[in-house]
From Swiss-Prot:
Domain UvrD-like helicase C-terminal span(s) in chain numbering: 478-745
Entry similarity comment: Belongs to the helicase family. UvrD subfamily.
TM region positions: none
GO function terms (MF aspect): 3'-5' DNA helicase activity; ATP binding; ATP hydrolysis activity; DNA binding; exodeoxyribonuclease V activity; magnesium ion binding
Biological function: A helicase/nuclease that prepares dsDNA breaks (DSB) for recombinational DNA repair. Binds to DSBs and unwinds DNA via a highly rapid and processive ATP-dependent bidirectional helicase activity. Unwinds dsDNA until it encounters a Chi (crossover hotspot instigator) sequence from the 3' direction. Cuts ssDNA a few nucleotides 3' to the Chi site. The properties and activities of the enzyme are changed at Chi. The Chi-altered holoenzyme produces a long 3'-ssDNA overhang and facilitates RecA-binding to the ssDNA for homologous DNA recombination and repair.
Protein name according to UniProt: RecBCD enzyme subunit RecB
Organism: Buchnera aphidicola subsp. Baizongia pistaciae (strain Bp)
GO BP, sorted A to Z: double-strand break repair via homologous recombination
EC number annotated for this UniProt entry: 3.1.11.5, 5.6.2.4
Residues involved in ATP binding: A24, S25, A26, G27, T28, G29, K30, T31
Matches recorded under Pfam families: UvrD-helicase (PF00580), UvrD_C (PF13361)
Active-site residues, record numbering mapped to chain: D1088 (for nuclease activity)
Cofactor binding note: Binds 1 Mg(2+) ion per subunit.
Subunit structure: Heterotrimer of RecB, RecC and RecD. All subunits contribute to DNA-binding. Interacts with RecA.
């Protein structure tokens, strides 16, 4: 361990070698500093000989932890390369840091040339998320690359976990008695609530691994042990209860608590419980605590109770843990995780975090070779947001970048708030302790001097504000450029921090929430209305402008807090948007109403459906009107005509047009308002219309479209791909409400933190205790206090993030009440942290809950001119400043911009659909009616005589599909499962006698020598070297016409089409799948199976005959398309790919003719025409 005092950093001069840790407080220019270091490495402005020549853009590795940050870094690096190049051309920059960097340049033409080359190769930027980097590294290894291709990424684990939890729930409870089941159902009433509790543990693989090694208790045995304890106690109480009253009276116990009536009632209640015939659960009367030895001693002046043995026994009894929750959680976690892993292996899934595990295993086991390969590819690495790392992630980089190899770690441990997603502050602190070169950024470039000084004051009053030894708070300096930054209302300069103080000492949590929400709404209303009049202004960079909606952000913890605030804002006509909200449109109230209306449009003559549609809030008909529909004939006709008209609109103009007409006809206004819970939301309705319009491109059948909608409504939220509501507000017309976690990295001129005085993390959960115990096996005493400290420390970091979002002003809600939280029972281990984090910081870390102490500390803070304490809300703020309502009713629909542009000719098509449109006159020109009749007679005769051969196997599309399924599912190396095959025959209503014929037929196909020169047989293919049914999508670049394709094939006679293709122009995507792609002796081949019936003998499948069939059915066109797919795939995956060296050719296997007879009948081999492929590439 290295003890280091971090130094203030100058990013233009810092030596660049070895491991470097840079801690960057909020607003200190972390990303800008990273870009300067990047440019230095690019230009070789470094003291280290190794990097003096400069590095290529692809050699500088940048890793971060979220896709959003990755994208931001990419933009910033691109921008500053361009900016610095311009500065080099001018030999001047008004940016202080860039001007310092310019002074380091000795050869400007060379520098400009390097930066120009960097700009030209900007697409080679090596910026990744941690998962993206691990994936890239794994692909360096051929074996892992194949592994990645074979497995499927499991993007969302919750649906699979939920499915497994339901399965676990069923079998676990099946073997438990009703009594134990009843106890467990008190903890969790269904699999979802269980999964919600254990999910954090399931996501921590290392802890699960540790848990498997611990000794597990049997839940049934533990139940009977605890029941036995309770029975024993009951027996002792029954024996001793008649003496308890007299023993208590003998002591000098507090008579105001232990009154005669209280004693009598308590003893009677406990005795009634103790004398019950049966003991089935863990219920213990709450009155028993009054007879604990420890409790009585506190309430008496006596030194000793006369006979204390029984009272001490009560103490011991109540200290026992009468719960099966922990055992159940451990059982559930281990079983569900084991089943989850089985499913992953079975379905060949891998999670994003598996990439990190795979990468660590590879680097750790094959350390030197792979590390050298990575070092050669990326000589330096910059890791952003390093505080969000964990042990495994850091160890990967530690293994690769040893000794003098440059590894720059940029972080802010004060903003480490993502423990729920796997980040581990302990890992960060451990890594920090091993790094010698530590620096910190000392200037805040974001906020006003007043905000900076106020936050410095708050956190500097504590020696260790974050409760963790190595998380140090360094006061930051303000930048001169922000000296004039200010917020004024009616000519009065607003303070940096304003504490909105509620002086009611007995306020409840709901009362406080209501009070602070109203106060927040009124302040915002006052600022906005003053801004509209020009009386509220913001000055940033010497530019003055009026306060607008977009300047204000309310920072909350969760969705409930956001809704509480939104309710009060709505009352004052203030639109707001919770930016963290993920409301699934399929769970909205409007979606079901749209479904009912569309069902009625498709069935306008069904009274039931029509009535249901009219009952919706969208159509808003009252009960009387709905009931009268069948009796009022003229109204019924009118209504039917209206719905028929909607159907015509749907057919002619699309479903979105229908929904727009509904909004106009029924005058739906924009009630995007929490006060109108039953009013339809116009923006939700239009968004639903957009989704349906988009889906109708691929689902043309209206009834199938309705079924798709119904399925998405009824399916579990987590088991379907959610479509999140995207409000269409103008940027400047709403107040932003954002969660603390989502606000990290963002900035706002004015912020309000209404609920900071409410305790964040209230109680320690069972899962948290299990996780802590597994991580801290050496700690044996006061574990709960340790967990509390850990949680409290994270809460302080959350508060720090919230406070540092502001540029000019921050209002914070606070109360004098002892604690604003729900009343909870006192824990057995007395909590050290009695107050919330805001009070803890204000009170300089003093853990007092007295009102007087808080008021004293606030008075001290008030002396600072940048801080204001408001306990009486000014009268001018109390006035209701109504913000003008925006015109968003149905008549303004003409100005509404639909967020999607629809191309109604855009479609999915396939080879089969294209060839379907061949002109009928040419399609059957070679087969006359007489010939067709003769063929059918022959086939019928074969079946009548019951001769079972591949030639007599039923023909047609259905049976062709069956043959393809069999070939897809059978192994090329193992025997065919007869039971499975019989099941398939049954599904297709075929005689079971076909089973043996089919098995032998399939073996003939697998063992057939396709090429005598190569001795090529499917049975000889290695399972790693082939893919069955390779699905593909080919985007059509421009409009596809039959003429284009016909011209391409016409110019190449060897591939010409016998019949011209004929179809309507198409835009969209061509989809399909290739039956088999395989690698054989360095070359790649594709196979297409054909089950066409040509004749009842092998001679019918001669090369001459099958060539005719291929031309007639456009199979040569199909082969060229498939060849294009394989050609493009190989180009992307093989370095130095050559068509002539790597593309082996194509096979069409007419499988009815393939048997043990040594003949090439039915086997068509060709090498595709590369010129046609090149021309097709211009289309697809």
């Amino acid at each position: 361990m290295i003890t280091t005092i971090p130094k203030s950093i100058n990013v233009t001069t810092i030596p660049l070698s070895g491991k470097i840790l840079i801690e960057a407080s909020a607003g200190t220019g972390k990303t800008f500093s990273l870009t300067i270091l990047y440019i230095r490495l690019l230009l070789g402005i470094t003291n280290h000989v190794k990097y003096k020549k400069g590095l290529l853009i692809k050699e500088i590795l940048v890793v971060t932890f979220t896709e959003h940050t990755r994208a931001e870094l990419e933009i910033r690096i691109k921008t500053y390369i361009k900016i610095f190049k311009t500065a080099c051309i001018k030999k001047y920059s008004n940016n202080y840091v860039l001007s310092k960097l310019l002074s380091k340049i000795t050869d400007f033409p060379k520098t400009i040339d390097i930066l120009s080359k960097a700009e030209n190769s900007i697409h080679e930027l090596s910026i990744y998320t941690i998962h993206g980097f691990c994936y890239k590294i794994l692909k360096l290894n051929k074996f892992n690359s194949e592994l990645m291709l074979q497995n499927k990424i499991l993007k969302h684990t919750y649906p699979l976990y939920l499915k497994i939890s339901i399965k676990f729930w069923k079998y676990y409870f099946a073997f438990l008695s009703l009594d134990i089941t009843s106890i467990l159902l008190e903890y969790f009433n269904n699999p979802k609530t269980l999964l919600k509790e254990i999910l954090p543990l399931l996501n921590k693989t290392q802890l699960i691994s540790k848990l498997t090694k611990t000794k597990r208790k049997n839940i049934v045995q533990e139940y009977y042990i605890l029941i036995k304890k309770i029975k024993l106690f009951k027996q002792k109480w029954a024996n001793y209860s008649h003496l308890i009253h007299s023993e208590i009276i003998k002591t000098n116990v507090n008579k105001r608590i232990y009154t005669k009536s209280n004693l009598k009632r308590w003893i009677n209640n406990i005795t009634a419980w103790a004398t019950q015939k049966q003991t089935k659960n863990f219920f213990i009367p709450s009155e028993l605590k009054y007879f604990r030895y420890s409790f009585i001693i506190k309430k008496t002046t006596s030194e000793k109770i006369l006979d204390d043995k029984f009272f001490k026994f009560i103490d011991t009894f109540l200290d026992s843990k009468f719960s099966l929750k922990e055992i159940f959680i451990i059982d559930a976690s281990l079983e569900i995780k084991a089943m989850f892993m089985q499913e992953k292996i079975k379905n060949r899934y891998f999670e994003y975090d598996d990439l990190i595990t795979f990468c660590w295993n590879m680097v750790n086991k094959n350390n030197f070779n792979i590390s050298q390969t990575i070092l050669k590819k990326y000589p330096v690495a910059l890791i952003d947001e390093f505080q969000d790392t964990n042990n495994k992630q850091y160890n990967i980089f530690k293994k690769i970048y040893k000794k003098e190899n440059l590894l720059i770690l940029i972080s802010d441990p004060k903003q480490a708030i993502y423990s729920f997603s796997g980040a581990d502050i302990t890992s960060y602190l451990q890594a920090k302790s091993n790094i010698k070169n530590q620096y910190f950024l000392d200037t805040n470039w974001r906020s006003s001097p007043k905000i900076i000084n106020s936050i410095n004051l708050l956190f500097s009053r504590l020696k260790n504000p974050f409760l963790t030894k190595n998380i140090t708070f360094y006061p930051v300096k303000s930048s001169r450029i922000n000296k004039t930054t200010k917020f004024e209302v009616n000519g009065k300069n607003q303070p940096a921090l304003r504490f909105l103080l509620n002086k009611n000492k007995n306020i409840s949590i709901n009362e406080y929430k209501e009070w602070i929400s109203i106060t927040t709404a009124k302040y915002i209303s006052y600022w906005i209305s003053s801004g509209i009049k020009g009386n509220a202004t913001i000055t940033i960079s010497n530019k003055v402008r009026t306060v607008n909606f977009s300047d204000i952000a309310i920072i909350v913890r969760n969705n409930l807090e956001a809704k509480t605030i939104q309710l009060e804002l709505t009352k004052l006509n203030i639109q707001s948007l919770y930016l963290t909200s993920k409301n699934n449109i399929f769970q909205s109230k409007e979606i079901l109403e749209i479904l009912w209306i569309l069902q009625a449009i498709l069935n306008p003559n069904i009274e039931r459906l029509l009535k249901r549609a009219m009952s919706t809030n969208i159509m808003s008909k009252n009960t009387k009107e709905i009931i009268s529909i069948p009796n009022n004939h003229s109204y019924w006709i009118k209504l039917s005509q209206e719905f028929n008209q909607y159907l015509i609109f749907w057919n002619n103009y699309g479903i979105l047009y229908v929904i727009q007409q509904l909004i106009i006809n029924y005058n739906i206004s924009n009630n995007n308002n929490l006060l109108h819970n039953f009013s339809p939301n116009i923006k939700n309705i239009l968004y639903i219309g957009e989704l349906l319009e988009e889906k109708s491109i691929t689902i043309k059948n209206k009834f199938l479209l309705i079924n798709w909608l119904k399925k998405n409504i009824t399916q579990d939220f987590y088991l379907t791909k959610p479509k999140y509501i995207k409000p269409n507000y103008e940027k400047n017309n709403y107040i932003k409400i954002v969660s603390i976690h989502k606000s990290k990295g963002l900035e706002y001129p004015i912020t309000i933190i209404p609920f900071a005085t409410i305790t964040f993390n209230k109680t320690v959960s069972t899962v948290e205790k299990i996780c802590f115990n597994l991580n801290n096996t050496k700690i044996k005493k006061q574990k709960t206090l340790k967990i509390e400290k850990h949680k409290f420390s994270e809460d302080i970091r959350l508060l720090y993030v919230a406070l540092t979002r502001s540029i000019i002003h921050c209002s914070i809600g606070i109360s004098l009440a002892q604690t604003i939280t729900q009343k909870k029972k006192i824990q057995k281990e007395k909590s050290k942290f009695k107050i919330n984090v805001l009070r803890y910081i204000i009170q300089s870390g003093k853990n007092h809950i007295s009102t007087k102490k808080l008021y004293t500390e606030l008075s001290i803070l008030k002396k600072n001119k940048n801080i204001e304490i408001i306990s009486e809300i000014p009268n001018i703020i109390k006035k209701n400043f109504q913000i003008p309502t925006l015109n968003t009713n149905s008549q303004s629909l003409m100005h509404y911009q639909v967020s999607r542009k629809f191309n109604y000719n855009y479609n999915f098509t396939s080879y089969s659909q294209l060839k379907k449109n061949i002109k009928p006159s040419t399609m059957y020109s070679t087969l006359n009616t007489k010939k067709l009749f003769e063929l059918n007679v022959k086939k019928k005769h074969c079946f009548e005589n019951k001769i079972l051969t591949p030639h007599t196997f039923p023909s047609g599309k259905i049976y062709g599909t069956l043959l393809h399924k069999i070939l897809k599912n059978i192994s090329f190396h193992k025997s065919i499962n007869s039971n499975w095959l019989l099941k398939k025959l049954s599904e297709y209503n075929l005689d079971k006698r076909w089973c043996l014929i089919l098995k032998n037929w399939m073996y003939s196909i697998l063992y057939k020598n396709l090429d005598k020169n190569y001795n090529l047989r499917l049975s000889k293919l290695d399972s790693k070297n082939y893919i069955k049914e390779l699905k593909f999508l080919l985007p059509i670049k421009k409009k596809l016409t039959a003429l284009k394709l016909n011209n391409i094939f016409q110019t190449h006679q060897c591939s010409s089409l016998e019949n011209k293709l004929c179809f309507h122009p198409i835009q969209g995507i061509l989809s399909g799948s290739i039956d088999l792609v395989f690698l054989w002796k360095t070359k790649y081949f594709l196979v297409d199976y054909k089950s066409n019936w040509i004749g009842n003998s092998n001679q019918s499948y001669s090369q001459q005959n099958i060539k005719k069939i291929i031309k007639k059915h456009h199979y040569n066109f199909q082969l060229q398309l498939y060849s294009l797919v394989l050609h493009r795939y190989l180009k992307q995956h093989i370095k130095n790919y050559s068509f002539y060296n790597h593309f082996g050719g194509t096979y069409i296997l007419f499988i009815r003719s393939i048997n043990e007879i040594p003949s090439q009948n039915g086997i068509f081999y060709s090498i595709p025409n590369i010129e046609i492929i090149k021309k097709l590439e211009q289309i697809f």
